[in-house]
């Protein structure tokens, strides 16, 4: 078993990371292994300057790898993810005494331009969640959308929800987030009403998934993505609506109303407030639009144009 395979086994068995996280590590480290295997002489022999075993790499080898991935057209964000996986891998090797220093510790990928998350305005969000409940699966769709927008869950968190995680009388949901961290999140009154209706209709037990898939178990993330796109079209929305737009909209609208960045951080389950601060830029965009529409000098400037 290679060092990379051992590390992946450690992540799965000891760290018990999610399947999604494990797949991401596997893809990123597979790219490193493939690059190493491609470093051959004209005779097809492994280049003596590049070890076939990634555990023997130094920082120069990793810089060559990152440069090769960059030439291949990988985005700055993807390069950052590749390096993050490498740092975790080499930190694991270091902790186990396999290497004396991590070759990835000092390496930095190019900074990715920070894109602002796409959001729906309040009217658009309401139009999306108020899908007809008399259509096939209408009660489920309404409950799913209401919970998504009401509580700002991640897509993976929404799909994993079980009825036992919900306390509809108290209006709270216990969410198992990234890193197996639990957090309590409020559930709005419209979402509670939709969930009660959906549970009465489905007759589900406490251990059942709130939103089951066709084959049993939890609904897949892909199924939710497709369904939300379909529902957005049915509701006459012309934006390319994707699930995380509801989470982003939740965060943006809460921050816009309250100005409480720390509170939004806790609701979203962000470990680093810097991740939450992206929504302050959205709030500033909104304020800038209000200014342009309302400030007398802004209006005069617009009229002059």
From Swiss-Prot:
Chief place where the protein resides: cytoplasm
Active site (catalytic residues): 154, 178, 244, 247, 270, 279 (o-(3'-phospho-dna)-tyrosine intermediate)
Entry keyword Cell division: yes
Keyword Zinc: no
Biological process terms in GO annotation: cell division; chromosome segregation; DNA transposition
Family annotation (Pfam families): Phage_int_SAM_1, Phage_integrase
Sequence ranges assigned to domain Tyr recombinase in this UniProt record: 115-292
Subcellular location: Cytoplasm
GO molecular function ontology, one term from the record: tyrosine-based site-specific recombinase activity
Record's keyword terms, sorted: Cell cycle, Cell division, Chromosome partition, Cytoplasm, DNA integration, DNA recombination, DNA-binding
Main function: Site-specific tyrosine recombinase, which acts by catalyzing the cutting and rejoining of the recombining DNA molecules. The XerC-XerD complex is essential to convert dimers of the bacterial chromosome into monomers to permit their segregation at cell division. It also contributes to the segregational stability of plasmids.
Family of the protein in this entry: Belongs to the 'phage' integrase family. XerC subfamily.
Protein name per Swiss-Prot or TrEMBL: Tyrosine recombinase XerC
